Amino acid sequence: MRIGVRGHDVEHSSLDSLFGNIHKQGFYCTQLALSKAVKEFKVNNGVMTPGLAFYIRELCIRNNVDVAVLGCYLNLANPNKEQLAKTQNTYKAHIRFASLVGAGMVGTETGAVNEEYSFTPDNHTDEALKTFIEGLIPVVEYAEKMGVTIAIEPVYKHIVCDFKRARKVLDAVNSPNLQLIFDPVNVIYAGNYERQDEIIREAFELCGEDICCMHLKDFVVDNGEVKSVISGRGLLNYPLLMSYVKTYKPFVHCLLEDTKPDNAAEAKHFVEDMYDKAELLC
């Protein structure tokens, strides 16, 4: 397991200090969302030049940190065709950048059927899934040309809300450059949290070969609502999850989420301890 942290969850004043602080905290990798992590200048498609990519790559090498995921979390199901085209171009810019910076993948969530990118029951329809796939295919085709992996992240409130739908997307697009980020908490809600073991097993049974990265946090139930917290402070079955990771994904990038500079070490130590204690499943 290669444990890391999101760049925008680390205290820093510059890209140089960002990667230095990630290394000082004992992390091996990061998820880099440029628009959130870069503080020196505004990030847009034109800013993502080879020069910037090589500079970040140099910082990574100097600090022994991988860019596990280059984040681009936009709406590929936007009903506004003009905005969708702009979004697809932004994904292509991130794909080019990922190929130069040495990122493991470009990560994305799976959108909503409205321009606001908000939850509606319509997100869970077959028509919504078809719309997302249509928006995703040109992006994956470009990723194939550039030798980059696109990784989709299922989220209950979004279009790909579970691993049955994730499997449908993977099969429909049918590309070796399309894989999956697995965040168990993202697909847990008030109606299914008691079946979390089943959800973890289903993810690996349906999509295990395509899981290329893990997002790690925890959850609590407060007044009937599932809320995310840092790893170790909630109800997620980490012994089961880490058994799957240890058995089937031993060196996978595992990125902590929802941490702050003053509690990242706590979450890191908890996850490492759970991994060390995890039993192999076969």
Predicted feature locations:
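N-terminal pre-domain/capping segments
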Residues: 1-103, 175, 179, 272-282
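Acidic/histidine-rich catalytic cores of soluble enzymes
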Residues: 2, 30, 70, 133-235
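Active-site beta-loop-alpha junctions enriched in small/polar residues
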Residues: 6-10, 33-37, 72-75, 111-113, ...
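Structural motif corresponding to alpha-helix initiation and N-cap regions
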Residues: 12-16, 50-54, 92, 163, ...
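Active-site acidic/histidine proton-transfer and metal-coordination neighborhood
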Residues: 17, 54-55, 59-63, 78-180
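A short acidic, helix-capping loop that chelates divalent metal ions and anchors anionic groups
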Residues: 38-43, 76-80, 114-122, 188-191, ...
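H/E-rich (His + Asp/Glu) clusters that bind or coordinate divalent metals
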Residues: 234, 239-241, 246-248, 252-255
